[in-house]
Amino acid sequence: MPKMKSHRGACKRFKATGSGKVKRERMNGSHNLEHKNRKRTRRLHQSTLVDSTKEKQIKRMILA
């Protein structure tokens, strides 16, 4: 049986941290920012962690 391929789209969107959690970028922070307030755009540029219910599924895609 051949090796499992990692999901290239998931690899571009998610990163595994050293402690084993999965990091992601927030949506809606790349363009059309002129009508969003400054506090919101600042928060959108910060990365966050993936929810624990989806973590196992995403790890399987990026570490396959």
From Swiss-Prot:
Keywords: Ribonucleoprotein, Ribosomal protein. It comes from Chlorobaculum parvum (strain DSM 263 / NCIMB 8327) (Chlorobium vibrioforme subsp. thiosulfatophilum). PANTHER family: 54S RIBOSOMAL PROTEIN BL35M, LARGE RIBOSOMAL SUBUNIT PROTEIN BL35M. Residues 17-41 are annotated as: Disordered. Belongs to the bacterial ribosomal protein bL35 family. One of its GO terms (biological process) is translation. NCBIfam families: rpmI_bact. One of its GO terms (molecular function) is structural constituent of ribosome. One of its GO terms (cellular component) is cytosolic large ribosomal subunit. Signal peptide: none annotated. The keyword Transmembrane does not apply. It comes from the Bacteria. The lineage of its organism: Bacteria, Pseudomonadati, Chlorobiota, Chlorobiia, Chlorobiales. The keyword Cell division does not apply. Residues 25-35 have a biased composition (Basic and acidic residues). HAMAP family: Ribosomal_bL35. InterPro entries: Ribosomal_bL35, Ribosomal_bL35-like, Ribosomal_bL35_CS, Ribosomal_bL35_sf. This is Large ribosomal subunit protein bL35.
